[in-house]
Amino acid sequence: PVYISIGCNLPAIPHPTFSRDPVPFSLAPKLSNQMGLEAAVEAAAEFLNKAVKPVLVGGPKLRVAKASDAFVELADASGYALAVMPSAKGMVPEHHPHFIGTYWGAVSTAFCAEIVESADAYLFAGPIFNDYSSVGYSLLLKKEKAIIVMPDRVVIANGPAFGCVLMNDFLKALAKRLKHNNVAYENYHRIFVPDGTPLKSASKEPLRVNVMFQHIQKMLSSETAVIAETGDSWFNCQKLKLPEGCGYEFQMQYGSIGWSVGATLGYAQAVPEKRVIACIGDGSFQVTAQDVSTMLRCGQKTIIFLINNGGYTIEVEIHDGPYNVIKNWNYTGLVDAIHNGEGKCWTTKVFCEEELVEAIAKATGPKKDSLCFIEVIVHKDDTSKELLEWGSRVSAANSRPPNPQ
């Protein structure tokens, strides 16, 4: 890398060769190569129409390709079972009649991985396969069964690759060429068993995380959005059923701890008509807590659930050590200090289900126009079963010996 230092007085110095008027910023629109597009659609249609039980899986690059609507059109036209990768949750409507949940290998929504991995053809639209999304590279997928559609490139069955083909154009054209085939969804529907519910809490019993998320589920509507912090909230928020119009943000490309505090600030500022519900662990919050100050200055009405379990729980499952136990803070006291009597802010600390119900009622009632900070005290070992499975697999992948090649 090279750094060029320029004196602060130099950029404004005029010169006769410079245009006096500002040059308008514009990006030339990208266009598909028509011959490549037609060839890619022809090859994909031939491949998928021969399959017995094909499926569709949406990935996070649907957003950058602006192809979510085209992907849903393809699902409507084809009748294929429809799943999403974890970081694409919220980009595909979960009320779609053929939606089968999140495909995340061993920690997928119940019955979803079995349907996807047993399919004889799968189309992935905008996937990212890294150690986290592949659960330590343990996905049971075969490249020769897959069509990989990237924002400007299509690869058919690990063979022919077609460049300069935009995802949006490809999916729309492919929808017109596929035969209707709902075998995979029918198989899913046949074996599906609804989720169970958490055990009922005894009076004043210490709050369990699965009980807390049962109550968060009831808060969701088209007027809310969920921000899931890196950590166990990844897995608990994945299991939330998003109503139509409910926003959702989830970052796992880098596993960035603390990202959700700033993301909550930005989302609430960009979409003021929605009430943001952020689920943040105590370890993550310590990294970026100061962003709450700007939330208050901007008059945001976010609900933050600070899940205090005394450490970096996700890191414990990947690689445990004394560094994963953190100094406990008085989190509500910290937010009260940041509030400092300016703006609308309400904080509380809850230890049991009764207190949680009361806090949610207050946050969605009398304090609905305030930033609400609810610190939830839970046991340090209270994790989702998905984190236990995922952590074991990622830990094994991370600790494997280096490849000599």
From Swiss-Prot:
User: For this protein, what does the record note about how its cofactor is bound?
Assistant: Binds 1 metal ion per subunit.
Q: Which reaction does it catalyse?
A: a 2-oxocarboxylate + H(+) = an aldehyde + CO2
Q: Which domain of life does the protein's organism represent? A: Eukaryota
Q: Which protein, by its recorded name, is this?
A: Pyruvate decarboxylase 2
Q: What Pfam families does UniProt report for this protein, alphabetically? A: TPP_enzyme_C, TPP_enzyme_M
Q: Which GO terms describe its biological process?
A: aromatic amino acid family catabolic process to alcohol via Ehrlich pathway
Gene Ontology molecular function, alphabetical: magnesium ion binding; pyruvate decarboxylase activity; thiamine pyrophosphate binding
**From which lineage does this chain's organism come?**
Eukaryota, Viridiplantae, Streptophyta, Embryophyta, Tracheophyta
Signal sequence, renumbered to the chain: none
From the UniProt entry, list the residue stretches annotated as the region Thiamine pyrophosphate binding: 232-314
Family recorded in the similarity comment = Belongs to the TPP enzyme family.
Amino-acid positions noted as binding Mg(2+) in the UniProt annotation, renumbered to this chain: D282, N309, G311
What keywords does the record list, in alphabetical order? Decarboxylase, Lyase, Magnesium, Metal-binding, Thiamine pyrophosphate
User: Required co-factor?
Assistant: a metal cation; thiamine diphosphate
- Originating organism: Pisum sativum
Binding residues for substrate, per the UniProt record?
A: E315
